[in-house]
Curated annotation (Swiss-Prot):
It comes from the Archaea. Forms part of the ribosomal stalk which helps the ribosome interact with GTP-bound translation factors. Residues 141-160 are annotated as: Disordered. PANTHER family: 60S RIBOSOMAL PROTEIN L12 (PTHR11661), LARGE RIBOSOMAL SUBUNIT PROTEIN UL11M (PTHR11661:SF1). The lineage of its organism: Archaea, Methanobacteriati, Methanobacteriota, Methanomada group, Methanobacteria. It comes from Methanosphaera stadtmanae (strain ATCC 43021 / DSM 3091 / JCM 11832 / MCB-3). Keywords: Ribonucleoprotein, Ribosomal protein, RNA-binding, rRNA-binding. Residues 151-160 have a biased composition (Acidic residues). This is Large ribosomal subunit protein uL11.
Length: 160
C-alpha cells in the first residue's frame, strides 16, 4: 500500500478546492470534494482559525484519511480575546489583557500538543505565547504572572 501524506493549514470550516488545498491534493487523484466536505465538517468548531490538517491518501485505492490538529496557540488566544492580531511591537505596545482562567482554557485545548506534564505548566506555556504576542496577563507582563503562578497565587484556577 503506497500512501502519501499532505499536511496543510486551512481555515476552520472554510476549506475550498482552491489554494492551498487544491494544488496540494490534486496530484493525489482523490475525490477533492469529499476531502473538502470532510475537512469542513471536522473543522467547523474552529471557524475563523487556521487549523492543521493531515491528509493521508492511499495511492492504490484512492481512499483517504483526514486527521485534524488543534489550531496554533496564537490562534486560540486571539479567538479567546476576540481580536485579530497581537501587538506589532511586543514589549512596548500591549494588544490586550488575558486572564489566567483564559490561559488555562487554552492550555486545556492544547494540552496534548504542549511539552508540559500538567495544566499549571501548560498554562505557563500559553502565557509565554502571550508575552511574545504583546498580550498582558492579569494586567501585567506575562512573565510576572508566570512567577505568581509559581508562587501559588492562582492554584485555585488549577483545582477546578
Amino acid at each position: 500500500m503506497a500512501s502519501q501524506t499532505i499536511e496543510i493549514l486551512v481555515e476552520g470550516g472554510k476549506a475550498t478546492p482552491g489554494p492551498p488545498l487544491g494544488p496540494a491534493i490534486g496530484p493525489l487523484g482523490i475525490n477533492m470534494m469529499q476531502v473538502v466536505e470532510e475537512i469542513n465538517k471536522k473543522t467547523a468548531d474552529f471557524g475563523g482559525m487556521k487549523v492543521p490538517v493531515k491528509i493521508t491518501a492511499d495511492m492504490d485505492t484512492k481512499d483517504f484519511e483526514i486527521s485534524i490538529g488543534t489550531p496554533p496557540t496564537t490562534a486560540l488566544v486571539l479567538d479567546e480575546l476576540g481580536i485579530e492580531s497581537g501587538s506589532h511591537e511586543p514589549g512596548t505596545e500591549v494588544a490586550a489583557d488575558f486572564s489566567v482562567e483564559q490561559a488555562f482554557k487554552v492550555a486545556r485545548m492544547k494540552f496534548d500538543d504542549l511539552l508540559a506534564n500538567d495544566y499549571k505548566h501548560a498554562t505557563k506555556e500559553v502565557i509565554g505565547t502571550c508575552v511574545s504576542m504583546g498580550i498582558n496577563v492579569q494586567g501585567k507582563d506575562g512573565r510576572e504572572t508566570q512567577k505568581d503562578i509559581d508562587n501559588g497565587d492562582y492554584d485555585d484556577v488549577f483545582t477546578q
